[in-house]
């Protein structure tokens, strides 16, 4: 049976993972600047294997509006181009023989609002994940044997403090991303 400290540590660890997942989701949202992270979820069919794009090529940003993808094997050039074209990012790769250039167009106001809306959805998903972890932790607190009513209440209050802290972190990360998108 777990004790209060291990429940709190486990809850913090799981909530950290929820925040990391949230940040990963946000990293693929396009902002006004070129960011190699937007290609993170692209998978390339490389000699029959599905591989993340960053494992078959280097991705650089020579300027704020351009991504340059340089495959480590020229045979990967066309599959990379196809994977980018087929993705839902709406990018148009330009194959230059040994590298692929992607020019990122300016974001329209409408597109920025859509991106903020997506970010809000990711933030809400993260908040829900944190709250679900709180519920699980509260259930665990109630299962600890040998605790009096006051100790259970104190444990529940501690779990709530942890939850509030992580919900605030979600909000902070979201607001930062929102400024990045709208800015």
From Swiss-Prot:
This protein's GO CC annotations: cytoplasm
Main location: cytoplasm
GO MF terms, alphabetically ordered: ribosomal large subunit binding
Location within or outside the cell: Cytoplasm
A Pfam family matched in the record: RRF
Gene3D superfamilies in the cross-refs: 3.30.1360.40, Ribosome-recycling factor (1.10.132.20)
GO BP of this protein: translation; translational termination
Keywords, sorted A to Z: Cytoplasm, Protein biosynthesis
Function: Responsible for the release of ribosomes from messenger RNA at the termination of protein biosynthesis. May increase the efficiency of translation by recycling ribosomes from one round of translation to another.
Family classification: Belongs to the RRF family.
Name of the protein in its database record: Ribosome-recycling factor
């Amino acid at each position: 049976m777990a004790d209060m400290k291990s429940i709190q540590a486990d809850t913090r660890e799981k909530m950290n993972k929820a925040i990391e997942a949230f940040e990963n989701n946000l990293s693929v949202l396009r902002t006004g600047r070129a960011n190699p992270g937007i290609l993170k979820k692209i998978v390339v069919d490389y000699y029959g294997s599905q591989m993340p794009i960053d494992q078959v090529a280097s991705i650089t940003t020579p300027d704020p509006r351009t991504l340059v993808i340089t495959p480590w094997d020229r045979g990967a050039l066309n599959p990379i181009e196809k994977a980018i074209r087929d993705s839902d990012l709406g990018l148009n790769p330009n194959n230059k023989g040994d590298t692929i250039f992607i020019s990122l167009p300016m974001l329209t106001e409408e597109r920025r609002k859509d991106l903020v809306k997506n970010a809000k959805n990711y933030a809400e998903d993260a908040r829900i994940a944190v709250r679900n972890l709180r519920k699980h932790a509260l259930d665990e607190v109630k299962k600890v044997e040998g605790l009096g009513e006051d100790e259970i209440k104190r444990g529940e209050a501690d779990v709530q403090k942890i939850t509030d802290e992580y919900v605030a972190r979600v909000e902070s990360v979201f607001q930062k991303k929102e400024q990045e998108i709208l800015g």
